[in-house]
Amino acid sequence: MPQELGLYPDLTALEFLDYMAVLKGITDRRGREQQIAELLERVRLADVAKRRLKTYSGGMKRRVGIAQALLGNPQVVIVDEPTSGLDPEERVRLRNLLGEVASRCTVILSTHIVEDISQSCRDLAVINKGQVAFQGGPGELIAQAQGKVWLVKTAGEKPDGATVVVSSMHLHDGTQYRVLGDLSAHPQATPAEPSLEDGYIWLMQGVVKE
């Protein structure tokens, strides 16, 4: 399923899925109708199946895309940036749907949204310039930044020794930075537990240097 879906705006979800099923070679009409009805239930669009696609929200269109991808019961489904641009509620709904799909087939998620990976994936790979820079579980990627994450409060200047500033928060008496690097000697540095994002950033720092 691509990030930008090529839907036909004047078709209903029912008509669109029927058309795509025919293109996929599902020629038995009764079997096609049954499969489409089941998929619409799974993606929670059965009650709006006869509405034109141009009236759907972005999240609803993504769910139509997933239903289309599942036509014909594929063994592998690839989704590209599935939650990009969605509001938090629809993002959670779509992640849960992909989790349900993953119980029936292999789902490959291509995304830059770290939260989607941490919530949905047990195995992951980091691709850099066409090469696999990392392959393993989320915990293994997080471990890349173990001992490298620090919280530092300053008057506003970036703390010395910080390789990367991950985030900064302005407070009433200064600025708190979350940084990656070796700040063990910094008097105001407090060690913090690494996140998946920290692990990814630290990994890529090493990859770029190489």
Identify what each model region corresponds to.
Residues 18, 22, 30-48:
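Conserved ABC ATPase "signature" region
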Residues 52-56:
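Conserved ABC ATPase signature
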Residues 66:
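Hydrophobic anchor residue at the start of the ABC signature
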Residues 73:
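Conserved catalytic motifs of ABC-family nucleotide-binding domains
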Residues 77-81:
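Catalytic Walker B motif of ABC-type/P-loop ATPase nucleotide-binding domains
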Residues 93-179:
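ABC transporter nucleotide-binding domain
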